[in-house]
Amino acid sequence: MSDPKKLFIKTYGCQMNVYDSERMAEALGGQGYVETQSAEDADMILLNTCHIREKAAEKVYSELGRFKGLKAAKPDLKIGVAGCVAQAEGEEIMRRQPLVDLVVGPQSYHRLPELEAKTRAGEKALDTDFPEEDKFEKLKGRPKAKRGPTAFLTVQEGCDKFCAFCVVPYTRGAEVSRPADRILREANELVERGVREITLLGQNVNAYHGAGPNGDMTLAGLIWELDKIDGLERIRFTTSHPNDMADDLIEAHGTCAKLMPYLHLPVQAGSDKILKRMNRSHTAESYLRLIERIRAARPDIVMSGDFIVGFPEETEADFQDTLDLVEQVRYGYAYSFKYSTRPGTPAAERAQVDPAEADDRLQRLQAVITRHQREIQDGMVGREVSVLFEKPGRQPGQMVGKSEYLHAVHVQDPGLEAGQIARVRIVASGANSLAGELA
């Protein structure tokens, strides 16, 4: 019996890419591939790329350049580029880096087995179509092997919002929701493999409207169906748009015990002028009122957000509006970035903010966000939380997991196991984690 072929996947970017990489590995598993953590040992290398940040494509080309020596030493090595850079660049990747054998977009990776076979026949393989067929239906069921206690599950892809800074509608396409029965089937398969927490993924996940037994189902309806699965203890979802935060979803945060008290709800800016230029279709005031309604339903919920500073035409007054919004919301987590020009997006054509000024604003914003994060984490000391333990910590006998609020918690107890959920009393707060002891 011949040795299995080895597959090395490097994943960039969002949680959806992590999910996609898992499914690509499973698809190629049927071709005799097993995963390796070493590119040097691989028979196939796949870069699953992200196109959100500035110079994303150039970073991919630079990474590919590092494989030239490896390809020369192993002529049978196959190198592929997947994900959103593959979708955006297409055939240009092969032109600039002839060592690449395969380019596949995020809507076509269910075709990887036939594309891989094409490369083994000595041909180049390119597929960046938006096929009519459902890629999830074409993918086989999840393997039965045991896995960790948490998992991502994509329920929705694409976006119809067309924010002025974003390439997602161009690389992931229009909003598409998976039928509820297929999601529930996959969730059950994951639970059978030991998963106790599932995070539902979508570029605009709360716009979910997948087919259900009685017509389209909302995200809240899907969450309630997942709530019925024995063995599934926790549900999360990300990423959401404020305009799609429906009443039934807000209500679910207050009534569904398995839905964790954590919500990532990006706002991007606190200035109505900038929000309009971003094509966000909401105001700072409407966002703040939405936060009030969510907290009325679940008072202990921890909010998370995204911010872009230095957006074209942003003034100091606009930036102060963003700081004011952050002070009012007090995020437990927030991701902040300096605006980077994305060719092909409307914002790229507008007057740009001085880079030094944008850098200064980013530092000031991050200082406020960090202060709030530390205050919220310090406020956990003395409280009891529920922790799902995921893996051993750095110290002997230590286990690390996540609280319901997504805080990393480490506990010194040799009797704990991955997948166990326990009540923990928080005794100390650090920069990035909490220390606790079994309650």
UniProtKB/Swiss-Prot annotation:
Keyword tRNA processing tagged: yes
GO CC annotations, alphabetized: cytosol
Cofactor(s) listed: [4Fe-4S] cluster
SUPFAM superfamilies in UniProt: Radical SAM enzymes
Cellular compartment(s): Cytoplasm
Enzyme class: transferase
Domain TRAM: 378-439
Domain MTTase N-terminal: 5-121
Major localization class: cytoplasm
PANTHER family (UniProt xref): CDK5 REGULATORY SUBUNIT-ASSOCIATED PROTEIN 1, MITOCHONDRIAL TRNA METHYLTHIOTRANSFERASE CDK5RAP1
Family the entry assigns: Belongs to the methylthiotransferase family. MiaB subfamily.
Biological function: Catalyzes the methylthiolation of N6-(dimethylallyl)adenosine (i(6)A), leading to the formation of 2-methylthio-N6-(dimethylallyl)adenosine (ms(2)i(6)A) at position 37 in tRNAs that read codons beginning with uridine.
Name by which UniProt lists this protein: tRNA-2-methylthio-N(6)-dimethylallyladenosine synthase
Organism from which the protein derives: Ruegeria pomeroyi (strain ATCC 700808 / DSM 15171 / DSS-3) (Silicibacter pomeroyi)
Gene name of the record: miaB
